[in-house]
A protein has these predicted regions:
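Short, amphipathic alpha-helical "recognition" segments used to contact nucleic acids or chromatin
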Residues: 88-102
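Acidic, Ser/Thr-rich intrinsically disordered and amphipathic helical segments
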Residues: 7, 14-22, 38-39, 52, ...
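Charged, often Cys/His-bearing segments associated with DNA-binding zinc-finger transcription factors
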Residues: 1-82, 311, 318, 327-328, ...
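Short, surface-exposed loop/turn segments at secondary-structure junctions
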Residues: 78-85, 283-288
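Amphipathic alpha-helical protein-protein interaction segments
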Residues: 53-57, 83-87, 97, 113, ...
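Short, well-ordered alpha-helical scaffold segments within catalytic/effector domains
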Residues: 61-64, 91-92, 214, 218
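Short, well-ordered secondary-structure "scaffold" segments embedded in the functional core
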Residues: 101-357
Length: 357
């Protein structure tokens, strides 16, 4: 027991030394240096002491070091000075912080410098717009791989919606964002997945909730056709009638099992996205342009996660269970049909006198 206490004490001491050293290094002079004491004094005066600070923001000292450069950048940019975010890794970490809804930690630490949330959101949007083209090239890609169980098909398409606040006081003005299917005001996004890898290949712009799935697809049908290059894609019943614009395989309720199993992959992708980035699991309170930027960014990071942890392998047990249920349901329907057919034939034979009573 004493050895465990000693080891823990030594580890905490090393963490304190590392924390203090990195904090000191973070305040090295820049073009217009800001002393560490100036920022630290404001923060401590707001919370009282260091223990109360870490208890309030609910993070440990090592985690606090990751946020330190971001906090200083937000605080110093308020004064028009050079920020502390200098590397791409730190900027991407800032974006992932927002997508994971841990931006409140940054807001609490800069509360003495920035009174509103708008300034932080503007900073995030500027960074996101700068990195989004590079991330799209690297992570939103199409492998053009076919699967043997669904011949001639290379993509899966579906739409998903996010609730937004009512855009106007009068219902006629806000009717465009109202979805009769979901019964709420929402924004709609369409995602085309690679059928084998499960990564997003095409992400449409946002549309009001009243726009149908077919209208969303027809708005960028040329891009989809260029990516398909003669192959087809899987879609649900909401896309019936779009075959004239884009080669589509409509998966009906009683379609063969491989197509149904493959089409469910897009639902798994939406679930993975909302699981990783909780900011998309709740109502979106910002503007439509901001929604487009951060949704595309979330798809880039989700693609990276899917390539590391494939959807099909991660959900293999669940998918096997769904496949078995579908197969059992189909067998039950066929068996019921056989029984009813035999009963009908026997009754008709009896009525026509071909069989004894």
């Amino acid at each position: 027991m004493d050895n465990r206490v000693n080891v823990l004490g030594e580890r905490l001491e090393r963490v304190d030394q590392m924390t203090q050293g990195i904090i000191d290094a973070a305040f090295l002079p820049v073009r217009q240096p800001v002393p560490r004491e100036v920022w630290w004094k404001h923060v401590i005066s707001f919370y009282g002491d260091e223990d109360e600070l870490f208890n309030q923001v609910r993070i440990s000292k090592p985690v606090f070091l990751d946020y330190l450069a971001l906090v200083l950048d937000v605080a110093w940019e308020r004064r028009g000075r050079q920020g502390a975010i200098r590397s791409n890794r730190e900027r991407l970490f800032f974006l992932m912080t927002f997508l994971s809804r841990r931006i409140s930690v940054v807001e609490v630490l800069v509360a003495r410098f920035i009174r509103t949330r708008d300034h932080t959101i503007r900073l995030l949007k500027n960074i996101a717009v700068r990195f989004l083209p590079v991330l799209k090239v690297g992570m939103v890609r199409f492998f053009d791989e076919r699967v043997p169980d669904v011949p001639g098909c290379s993509m899966i398409i579906d739409c998903t919606s996010w609730q937004v606040k009512k855009q106007a006081l009068h219902f006629d003005d806000a009717f465009a964002h109202f979805s009769g299917k979901h019964g709420l005001y929402c924004l709609k996004k369409e995602v085309c997945l690679n059928i084998r890898s499960g990564t997003a290949a095409i992400v449409s712009k946002s549309f009001p909730g009243s726009v149908t799935d077919i209208q969303v697809l027809r708005s960028h049908a040329e891009e989809v056709n260029a990516v398909l290059d003669g192959s087809s894609m899987l879609a649900d019943l909401g896309y019936r009638g779009v075959q004239a614009d884009v080669p589509t395989i409509i998966v009906c309720d009683r379609e063969h099992i491989p197509s149904r199993t493959r089409r469910v992959l897009v639902e798994c992708y939406f679930g993975r996205l909302k699981m990783l980035w909780s900011v998309f699991a709740a109502r979106w309170k910002l503007g439509e342009q901001t929604f487009d930027v951060f949704f595309d960014l979330a798809c880039c990071f989700t693609n990276a996660d899917v390539l590391r942890r494939p959807l099909r392998e991660a959900d293999k047990t669940f998918n096997d269970g769904v496949r078995n249920l579908i197969q059992a349901e189909r067998e039950a329907v066929l068996q019921d049909y056989r029984v009813r057919s035999a009963q009908y034939r026997q009754r008709r034979r009896t009525e026509l006198g071909f069989a004894p009573n």
